Amino acid sequence: MDIIFSRDWAMPNLDTFSVKPIGDFVKKYLKENIISVDPFARDKDWFTYTNDLNPNTKAQYHLDAEEFCKVLQDKGLKGKVDLGIMDSPYSPRQISECYKQIGKKVAMEDTQSSLLYKRVRDALDPLIKENGIVLSFGWNTVGMGIKRGYEIIEIKLVCHGGAHNDTICMAEIKNSVI
């Protein structure tokens, strides 16, 4: 499968999906009447199931992202989710800021972003149905990965100018179990 690649420019925003090309990227995959999950939703209500650690957001749940995904598994959503979103904090500093906002003490293991991402991806994966899509956002293209049976179908770079890192938006499709 050929990977669709594009690049846009837009000013950065703390609310990732408010950046027009990024919001458009999400809406492209967010079809009506599908089951969608966002473990790091903040105030976005575009998705069927939303979560954010911060209780001052509009998310439906306020759990650790891994725990949220496991709650949905227990509710019978294994293999039923059409669209998963991975828009977690991009850096250890951002993780620390999120924890501090809610008065949670931050330990070194909490800011090991690769461990957080792996735990959440491992918990999100069983929810995604075959041919379901996961959209990942950040500063790399690690995504769900081939070991979990995913194939990259689209990458969009969004340049923010100056000394800002680009936001990398990636869509992956879940193939049959390897």
Regions found by a protein language model. Give the residues of each.
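Short glycine-rich, flexible loops that bind phosphorylated cofactors or substrates
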Residues: P92-Q94, G143
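Adenosine-cofactor binding site in Rossmann-like domains, unifying the SAM/SAH pocket
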Residues: L14-F17, F40-K78, L83-I85, Y90-P92
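Soluble or luminal CAZymes and related metallo-dependent hydrolases
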Residues: L14-I22, D64, Q112-V120
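Short glycine-dipeptide loop
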Residues: N33, I128-V134
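S-adenosyl-L-methionine
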Residues: M1-N51, T57, A163-M170, I178
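A short glycine-rich, Lys/Arg-flanked "PGG" loop and its adjoining helix->strand segment in the class I
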Residues: K100-E130
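Short, well-ordered beta-to-alpha junction loops that form the rim of enzyme active sites
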Residues: F40-R42, F137-T141
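Class I S-adenosyl-L-methionine
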Residues: G143-I178
